[in-house]
């Protein structure tokens, strides 16, 4: 990976690998071998979360990769996320320590607040990961909101940096208004914003704001609908892979649609975290550093924007968890 875009700088001077492996929905039995395969292909960035329920398996994969001697711990960038039920300052450190334990690590490269969603605390011994329902066995289970100021959660996140548990802290699923507010009181400024971002949801203003504020942006779901069709959160006809415009660009460069989407993401200055369970797709997804898109083709993809958000708690909260919980409105 000789391309200068193979990593992007973050505010503390670190280098953020621009293609990572997202681990959402990857089964436990796959990860212990998939992660070493990814490392052997050049991956150094792995995106995890408590809520994915597979951090112990990710940890086995990381341990296997380190044992193989291909990389050292210092070569890797491991991200995890604070879940919605742990926002109260009393629970933030314990949640981080649980992720560290599951991942077999002493320190995270990045710890993010997963959603601006504050749900009632569920003890580890009662259910872990706790998920979205407060009581899944209730007659009509739902999410249980509690009031926890985001500033209080952020203060506890800052203490994780002070304590050496994490190198950097950041946020997910925020817009410019909440970012401005956070920046006004943050002692340690957010290093990274992770949001849904793909050719059908380009979020140009949000990206520009973050770049001007020295906040790195991670694009999750860089292929758009593909992760959401099986969950009934997207229609099959919304697939980016069937889009004639991007297919035409892919043919022009002799690349796949997925490679074009990832190159666009990296070339516009974001980090992308595609998910896959196959070695062939792992290899395809990281082979994007041997070409560049023209300004015209970058603009064509920018103009594919439909403001189509697939991961929206206002929709899936009500459909799946019987709770209307808008955060983007």
Q: How would you describe each model-predicted region?
A:
Residues 92-113, 160-163:
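CE4/NodB-like, metal-dependent polysaccharide N-deacetylase domain
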């Amino acid at each position: 990976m000789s391309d200068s875009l193979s990593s992007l700088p973050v505010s503390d001077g670190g280098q953020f690998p621009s293609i990572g492996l997202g681990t959402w929905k990857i089964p436990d039995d796959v990860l212990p071998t998939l992660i070493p395969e990814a490392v052997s292909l050049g991956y150094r960035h792995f995106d995890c979360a408590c809520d994915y329920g597979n951090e112990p398996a990710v940890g086995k994969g990381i341990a296997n990769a380190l044992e193989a001697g291909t990389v050292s711990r210092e070569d890797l960038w491991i991200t995890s996320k604070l879940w919605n039920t742990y926002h109260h300052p009393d629970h933030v450190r314990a949640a981080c320590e649980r992720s560290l334990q599951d991942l077999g690590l002493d320190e995270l490269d990045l710890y993010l607040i997963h959603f601006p969603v504050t749900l009632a605390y569920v003890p580890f011994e009662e259910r872990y990961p706790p998920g979205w329902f407060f009581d899944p066995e209730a007659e009509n289970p739902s999410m249980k909101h509690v009031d926890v100021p985001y500033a209080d959660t952020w203060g506890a996140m800052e203490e994780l940096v002070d304590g050496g548990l994490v190198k950097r802290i950041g946020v997910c699923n925020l817009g410019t208004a909440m970012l401005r507010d956070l920046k006004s009181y943050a002692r340690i400024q957010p290093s990274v914003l992770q949001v849904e971002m793909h050719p059908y949801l380009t979020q140009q203003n949000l990206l520009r704001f973050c770049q001007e504020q020295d906040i790195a942006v991670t694009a999750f779901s860089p292929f758009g609908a593909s992760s959401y069709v099986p969950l009934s959160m997207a229609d099959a006809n919304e697939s980016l892979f069937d889009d004639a415009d991007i297919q035409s660009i892919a043919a022009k460069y002799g690349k796949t649609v997925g490679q074009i989407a990832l190159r666009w993401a990296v070339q516009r200055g974001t980090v992308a975290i595609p998910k896959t369970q196959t070695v062939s797709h792992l290899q395809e997804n990281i082979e994007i550093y041997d070409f560049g898109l023209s300004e015209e083709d970058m603009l064509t993809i920018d103009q594919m924007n439909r403001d189509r958000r697939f991961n929206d708690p206002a929709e899936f909260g009500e459909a799946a968890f019987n709770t209307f919980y808008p955060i983007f409105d």
